[in-house]
């Protein structure tokens, strides 16, 4: 297992180097002049040129790249022009908000999609099979920002069941003492049920928005994988041996159907990181997605590069976790690794 993990990490290094190079080049190709934006509309050419020199944008591109990689090797992602704060600090402060939202959305979608896919596979042609198909079609068809706007309109404007979509906490509540920077967990640790209730009420609509977006591929893959496994020889043998239907489904079929589902989960999690950008803007969520969008609009290089690099590292770590789960579920993967 350790050998397999080491190999995966070695293969990930060229990918991260490629991400650094491509991100640097793409940010430099963005329209707009960061120096002009930072100087303001009233600045003259001399002032803009002075700021350009201060930011190092007057240097050749190759020199800018080597300076960037040298800073990166020391953990320095640069400073944001719009906020004046170190990008590493901003990302560290905002990442828990995005992670909490993404993880809860994924948990909700998995809690619905896995049972729905299993039931649809074990009862083909039934009403629950048709429900699974309708749900997956709707989840794929609806844009994530449209789903968010509909939920806000229905549950906030029309019914009044949800609080205003303005961040992680209501204005009347203060943040719980920081332990994990996940408000739900920190509020439970502090035994502050009121803050927990407020944080959950703010989190539920954006999390459901992400869950609707991610539910379709998980349910569809679960159904297809279960149908393939249920028609296999070892399942027929288990049934012929007199085992109960629940034992056959849970012990034999479901476990063997999980490998492609886990692969789908890793892809869905990656998609959710991208969909987070739109959801955070709709719900004014203070995560790294909205931070990157604001930086992109203002041609602020450092936050965009920091955001992409953070997403790349998270993606590499996610793939490593998926490989470890493969080894836990299927011992053949450990032997091949």
What is the predicted role of each segment?
Residues 19, 23-27, 148, 152, ...:
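Juxtamembrane/transmembrane-helix interface segments of polytopic membrane transporters
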Residues 15-66, 155-195:
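Hydrophobic alpha-helical transmembrane segments of membrane transport/permease proteins
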Residues 58-114:
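An internal, D/E-rich "acidic patch" concept
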Residues 115-119, 128-180:
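Hydrophobic alpha-helical segments embedded in or immediately adjacent to the lipid bilayer
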Residues 2-3, 95-128, 144, 175-337:
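Alpha-helical transmembrane segments of integral membrane proteins
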Residues 1-60, 88, 92-93, 110, ...:
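N-terminal signal-anchor/first transmembrane alpha helix
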Residues 3, 7, 40, 50-53, ...:
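Short amphipathic alpha-helical coupling elements at transmembrane boundaries
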Residues 41-56, 147-160, 205-210, 247-264:
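Hydrophobic alpha-helical transmembrane segments
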